[in-house]
Amino acid sequence: MAKIIGIDLGTTNSVVAVMEGGEPKVIPNEEGGRTTPSVVGFTKTGERLVGQVAKRQAITNPENTIFSIKRFMGRRYNEVNEEMKMVPYKVQQAGDHVAVLAQGKEYSPAEISAYILQKLKKAAEDYLGETVTEAVITVPAYFNDAQRQATKDAGKIAGLDVKRIINEPTAAALAYGLDKKKDETIAVYDFGGGTFDISILEVGEGVIEVKSTNGDTHLGGDNIDQRIVEWLIDEFKKKEGLDLRAKGNEMALQRLRDGAERAKIELSTTMETEINLPFITADASGPKHLVERLTRSKLEEMVRDLVDRSIEPCRQALKDAGIDASKIDEVVLVGGQTRMPRIQQVVKEFFGREPHRGVNPDEVVAIGAAIQGGVLKGEVKDLLLLDVTPLTLSIETLGGVATPMIPRNTTIPTKKTETFSTAADNQNSVEIHVLQGERPMAGQNRTLGKFHLTGLPPAPRGVPQIEVTFDIDANGILNVTAKDNATGKDQKITITSSSGLSKEEVERMAKEADAHAAEDKAKKEEIEARNQLDGMVYQIEKMLKENGDKISPSERGDVENALADSKKALETNDAKQMNAARERLTAASHKLAEAMYKQAAPGAGAPGAGPGPEAAGGAQQAQAEPKKDEGVIDAEYVDVDEKK
C-alpha cells in the first residue's frame, strides 16, 4: 500500500517524513541532509537547482535565486511591500497577485514551492523504492484561505494529491502527544523563518484538540536577519562612506544576508561573533572589506521589538481558549528561530515555566505531518485530531458590515447556515461577498470571493428568505452556498481561486513540472554518458600511445576512427549518441586490450620468449628440469634439516 508522506514546507528549510513500522521517520535528501533549504536557483544555461546546491550559488546569482517564497504564497501584490524589500530577486504584479522573475521568466509562488516539493517527493521515492503520490502538507496556523489554497496548488503542480493541509503547531502537537497517556494543556510556540504561530491545545488519551490559535504571518527569522543586515550596512557606511543598498551591490547584499544568518546562529551558542566579509565592494581607492563584531546583547537589543511582538498573539490565544498562562502544563518550542536564547527567555517569562526542549524544532512539524498521513492511511489507530479555523469568516450585509458566520477558533470541519433577506423592494438578485478577518467592517477584511444569486421573484424588501451556508472542510478550505427558499434556486462557490491560479493554470504548471522532471532526468543521463565516454576516450588514447605498436595497422585505424567518432559525440548533448559511441570504442579497443594483457602475462618479457610455440616448449622444459635434478631437492631437504 502506497505511503502518505508528511511535508513541512518551510520558509527557510523543508523536511519530509513518513510512517515506517509504526514510527515516524525523517527522510534524508539526495545530499544526505535531513533538512532541505527552501531555495530554487535558475542558471544561465537553463538549469534549475533546488535545495543546498541552489543556496550555495545564491551569492553569485542573487537575482535568479528564489528563497523565502512562502512569504508570497497566496498573497496579493499590495500585501507584500515589506517582503519585497527583503529579497534580491524581482517580485512583480500578476493581476492582483504576485509573481517572481528569474532568467526572464515569470513564476508564481506556488510553482516555486512545487519545485521544492518535487525534490522532497523524489527523496521519499528513492528512500521507499516506490512512487509517492499522496501527502499531508503543513501550513502556519494563521495562514488564510488563499495561502492554504496556494499550498494545495503547489502540491498539485508537484504531482502530489494533498490529502490534508494541517497547521504547523497542530502537527508539532501530534508529534509531541503521540505517546501521551495523561491529559495535558500545551502551548505550541512556533517561531519559524517567515511566520509566527501560537496554538493552545489539549493533548491526551488519543485526542488532540486545538482550543485556539493566533499568529503573525509577517514575523519570522527573516526579519531578524534583516535587522542584522541593516546594522551591517549602517556600520559600513559610517566607516567607508559607501552605501551597500545602492544599485549594483546585489552580490554584496546576498553576502550580507549569508553573514547575518551565520552570525545569528552562532550567537545562540556564543556570546560574541565576528562577521568577516573581505572584498565586499570597491571604490577608486581599492577594495573594501567588512569586519564587524556582534555580541549577543547587541543582537537582542536590535530585535527586542520583534521578539516582543510574538507575545501579543500568545495573550490573545490564551484569552480565546479561556485559560490562564499558569494552567499551561508544557510549552513546546517549534521552528529554528526558537534556539535564540532571548526567545526562550521571553517564553519562560510569559508562561512562567521552562519551555520543553524534548523535540527537534526543525523536524517535529514534518514528523507530525507523517503521523497525520498514518492516521489517514489507517496505520495510526485511536488518534483523533480536532483543529480550528484561525480567522473569522463573514459575509457583507447592509451598510458594509461584516456579519460573522463562523467565528475564529471554531473546530473544523464545520457547517453553519444563516437566513438573510433583501435590502430593497423588488430586488431580483443578491451579491454574496465572502470575507475573512476580525474587523467589523467588510472593507477592512480580506475578500475571499463574491458571487450572485439571481432570478429572485419581485417582493418587498425583507420578505425573500435567502439561506447562506458556510462549509469548511478538514483542510480549512471554504465552500459557500446561497439558496432562495421560495424558488429553490441556489448558487455555490468554492473558494479555490483565491490563490490567484485557475484550475487550468495549475494543470498547465503540473504538466510543465512533469516535463521539467523529464528534462532533469535527461540532463542527468547526458552528464553520466558524457563522463563515462570522456573517461574512456582519455584511457584509450593513453593505451594507444603506449601500446599502439603492438596491434596491426588496420586494428589501430579502427581504434583511431572510434576515438574520432567519440570526440564528435562529446560535442553533442545526446546521451544515446554518446552511449553508442562508447560501445563502438569499447569494441574497437578490444584488440588493444588483448595486446596489453599478453604483454603483462607472466614470462612474457623473458629473453627469447615470443608468442610462438617455441616459448610454450621452453616453459614445459623449465618445469621439467627440477624433476631431473634430484640433488637440488635433496640439498634443500638437508638445509632445512640442518636449520632445525
Swiss-Prot record:
A Gene Ontology molecular function term of the record: ATP-dependent protein folding chaperone
Q: What positions are modified (Phosphothreonine)?
A: 195
Write out the biased-composition intervals (Acidic residues): 632-644
Entry superkingdom: Bacteria
Please give the Pfam families that the UniProt record associates with this protein. HSP70
Keywords, sorted A to Z: ATP-binding, Chaperone, Nucleotide-binding, Phosphoprotein, Stress response
Comp. bias regions, Low complexity: 612-624
Region annotation Disordered: where it falls in the sequence: 598-644
Q: Would the keyword Nucleus be found if you checked this record's keyword annotation?
A: no
**Gene3D superfamilies with a match to the protein in the record:** 1.20.1270.10, 3.30.420.40, Actin, Chain A, domain 4, Substrate Binding Domain Of DNAk, Chain A, domain 1
What is the induction note for this entry? By stress conditions e.g. heat shock.
Q: Which PANTHER family match?
A: HEAT SHOCK PROTEIN 70KDA (PTHR19375)
Family to which the UniProt record says this protein belongs: Belongs to the heat shock protein 70 family.
Question: NCBIfam families, from UniProt?
Answer: PRK00290.1, PRK05183.1, prok_dnaK
| Role, per record | Acts as a chaperone.
HAMAP family per UniProt: DnaK
Name assigned to this protein: Chaperone protein DnaK
Organism, by scientific name, is Koribacter versatilis (strain Ellin345)
